[in-house]
Amino acid sequence: MVVKVGINGFGRIGRIVFRNAIEHGEVNVVAVNDPFIETHYAAYMLKYDSTHGQFKGTIDVNSNGLTVNGKAVTFYQERDPASIPWGKHGVEYVVESTGVFTTTEKASAHLKGGAKKVIISAPSADAPMFVMGVNEKTYDPSVNVLSNASCTTNCLAPLAKVINDNFGLTEGLMTTIHSYTATQKTVDGPSSKDWRGGRTAAQNIIPSSTGAAKAVGKVIPSLNGKLTGMSMRVPTANVSVVDLTCKTEKPVTYDQIKQTIKKASEGELKGILGYSEDALVSSDLNGDSRSSIFDASAGIALNDHFIKLISWYDNEWGYSRRVVDLIAYIAKVDAGK
């Protein structure tokens, strides 16, 4: 089954969700809204990408929007989500990727335009969060607004799940070494709420806060209160890495951990959790569609209960693929299939 989807916000995630939807096959984007991007500029931004390269298909501009690989995509420039006529195009699921409408109340405005469900491509203060491979099976069709959590939570949660399910995770600290993003500065500038965040992204390692580790407790309730973490923003354009230092309930060797993660990556978490023994660096993972790629040769163990695990993720491409996967999954559940 192919699901009709709309995207609100044609920024980094909006455009990369669009590209992933074309590759996916089960999701068809038929409408896009962004009040700040007209269609000719949208075509240019979709075609050329400094990080992920030039779009391989065809893009044509017409009076209603774009034709991408022969399929029509209507464009709107509405500021109020309630004014976007999603229903006119048969849109069932809307990807809310502006970063502005991240609460249930705000995101619900899309329902007024005819959409059936809204998937927020960011953490939400009150909408239920789902991480593919971790808790998507708890999805209830009565939910109209849901969140795909964050890119970092999507990397950390599958890893934490494997450790917790097999060895018991008693407590842990996470650091994500995270590529800079659009909210950061090219030169030092004002940032009154986060002074460090106002410093030049390309010249600095910038300590920052993140709720990604605590959010794991929302998708894996048994880990609630057992994980927290922070972020280090670094001068790379894309690809990030999670460093999870944790204690296990059961005694375990690092080799046992590697074997267990490898098995999961080839089984129930295939396509979501990866496993590699290669000498990887961040650019090797650019464009990787998996949520979390465990670096077996980078982790260490202090003893049988205290370990450090390293896992890579393309914070743009991998995360956007999970947004599309989540839509395809809930569409099947909603259809009773």
UniProtKB/Swiss-Prot annotation:
Q: Where in the cell is it found?
A: Cytoplasm
Site (Activates thiol group during catalysis): which residue positions?
Answer: 178
May I have one GO cellular component term? cytosol
User: Pathway involvement?
Assistant: Carbohydrate degradation; glycolysis; pyruvate from D-glyceraldehyde 3-phosphate: step 1/5
Enzyme class per UniProt: oxidoreductase
CDD domains in the cross-refs: GAPDH_I_C (cd18126), GAPDH_I_N (cd05214)
Q: Which domain of life is it from?
A: Eukaryota
Binding of NAD(+), residues: 12-13, 34, 79, 315
SMART domains per record: Gp_dh_N
InterPro entries, alphabetized? GlycerAld/Erythrose_P_DH, GlycerAld_3-P_DH_AS, GlycerAld_3-P_DH_cat, GlycerAld_3-P_DH_NAD(P)-bd, Glyceraldehyde-3-P_DH_1, NAD(P)-bd_dom_sf
Annotated residues that bind D-glyceraldehyde 3-phosphate are located at 150-152, 181, 210-211, 233
Q: Which Pfam families match?
A: Gp_dh_C (PF02800), Gp_dh_N (PF00044)
Keyword set, alphabetical order: Cytoplasm, Glycolysis, NAD, Oxidoreductase
Q: Which GO terms describe its molecular function?
A: glyceraldehyde-3-phosphate dehydrogenase (NAD+) (phosphorylating) activity; NAD binding; NADP binding
Spell out the reaction equation it catalyses.
D-glyceraldehyde 3-phosphate + phosphate + NAD(+) = (2R)-3-phospho-glyceroyl phosphate + NADH + H(+)
Q: How does it assemble?
A: Homotetramer.
* Assigned protein family: Belongs to the glyceraldehyde-3-phosphate dehydrogenase family.
Q: What is this protein called?
A: Glyceraldehyde-3-phosphate dehydrogenase
Q: What is the lineage of its organism?
A: Eukaryota, Fungi, Dikarya, Ascomycota, Pezizomycotina
